[in-house]
């Protein structure tokens, strides 16, 4: 696997593949890779001739009091894991390469409406940072396909909307959330949890599963949410949000919606965890 922080080197290699009529899939990450990330790489490998990955801890998507400096950097281990999963090219730029004029002077991309809700409301500017870096990486790599995890459901929808609105010729693939044995969604931030907290955190997925059963049984949305919030709080979480949306439009869910998504964000101690579950009702 070739590892480079050079934009021109990435473009040169991708062009060489394209001149041979070969396809390229892209998996952007922030590093500290786990099985969930590697599943994305393997999915990318199954869909294209070549896989490009990136590792960039994007300062634009972190808020003032968030864990940018503490976010784990594990490049050597990540490189080994990416090779095993099938990546052939790894882009590891520095902030000065991505934002040479600084973030304040950087042109940005913002997807309206969806970016201001749920995670966007809790983390102002987060999705602007996500959309900007993903747009920039897409312009650098110019992939045929890009693969993302469904664990970050709102992020996935933001990216799909951006690609559609800006007429980018890229197919966006969402891959089902990979979970630990307890049901806890795999996340780089799980490393912040103690063993006891990890066991407590399994309540998130258990609660989502129970909510799905209640929705399929015809229980009212507000009642389902209210009961679930109590269960999450009783497990030691501080609720950020818990909501049910139309899985396609992201509007508030209606009983007539055939496909809904339950979304949750909650704090276990100082660690913010997110999860979601898609529920097909018809």
UniProtKB/Swiss-Prot annotation:
Q: Which catalytic residues are annotated?
A: 37
Q: Where in the cell is it found?
A: Cytoplasm
The entry's ATP-binding residues are 30-37, 149-152, 178, 186-189
Task: Quote the record's binding site residues for beta-alanine.
Answer: 61
Superkingdom to which the source organism belongs? Bacteria
Which EC numbers characterise this protein's activity in its record?
Answer: 6.3.2.1
Q: What is the catalytic activity of this protein?
A: (R)-pantoate + beta-alanine + ATP = (R)-pantothenate + AMP + diphosphate + H(+)
InterPro entries reported in the protein's UniProt record = Cyt_trans-like, Pantoate_ligase, Pantoate_ligase_C, Rossmann-like_a/b/a_fold
Instruction: Alphabetically list the UniProt keywords.
Output: ATP-binding, Cytoplasm, Ligase, Nucleotide-binding, Pantothenate biosynthesis
What is a single molecular function from GO for this protein?
A: pantoate-beta-alanine ligase activity
Query: Other notes on this protein?
Result: The reaction proceeds by a bi uni uni bi ping pong mechanism.
Q: What is this protein called?
A: Pantothenate synthetase
Organism, scientific name: Shewanella piezotolerans (strain WP3 / JCM 13877)
- State the gene name recorded for this protein: panC
């Amino acid at each position: 696997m070739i590892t480079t922080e050079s934009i021109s080197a990435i473009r040169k290699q991708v062009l060489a593949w394209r001149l041979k009529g070969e396809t390229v899939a892209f998996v952007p990450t922030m590093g500290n890779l786990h099985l969930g990330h590697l599943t994305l790489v393997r999915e990318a490998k199954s869909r294209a001739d070549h896989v490009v990955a990136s590792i960039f801890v994007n300062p634009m998507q972190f808020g003032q009091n968030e864990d940018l400096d503490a976010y784990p950097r594990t490049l050597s281990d990540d490189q080994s894991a990416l090779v095993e999963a099938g990546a052939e090219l790894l882009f590891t730029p520095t902030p000065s390469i991505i934002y040479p004029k600084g973030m304040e002077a950087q042109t940005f991309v913002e997807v309206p409406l969806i970016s201001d809700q749920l995670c966007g409301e809790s983390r102002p500017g987060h999705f602007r940072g996500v959309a900007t870096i993903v747009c920039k990486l897409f312009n650098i790599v110019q992939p045929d396909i890009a693969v993302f995890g469904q664990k970050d459901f709102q992020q996935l929808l933001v990216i799909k909307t951006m690609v559609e609105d800006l007429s980018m010729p890229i197919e966006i693939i969402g891959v089902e959330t990979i979970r630990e044995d307890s049901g806890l969604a795999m996340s780089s931030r799980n490393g912040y949890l103690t063993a006891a907290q990890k066991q407590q955190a399994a309540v998130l997925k258990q609660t989502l599963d129970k909510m799905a059963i209640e929705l399929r049984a015809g229980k009212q949305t507000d009642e389902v949410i209210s009961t679930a919030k109590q269960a999450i709080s009783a497990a030691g979480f501080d609720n950020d949000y818990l909501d049910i949306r139309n899985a396609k439009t992201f509007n508030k869910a209606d009983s007539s919606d055939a496909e809904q998504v339950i979304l949750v964000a909650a704090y276990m101690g100082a660690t913010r965890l997110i999860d979601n579950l898609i529920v097909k009702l018809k």
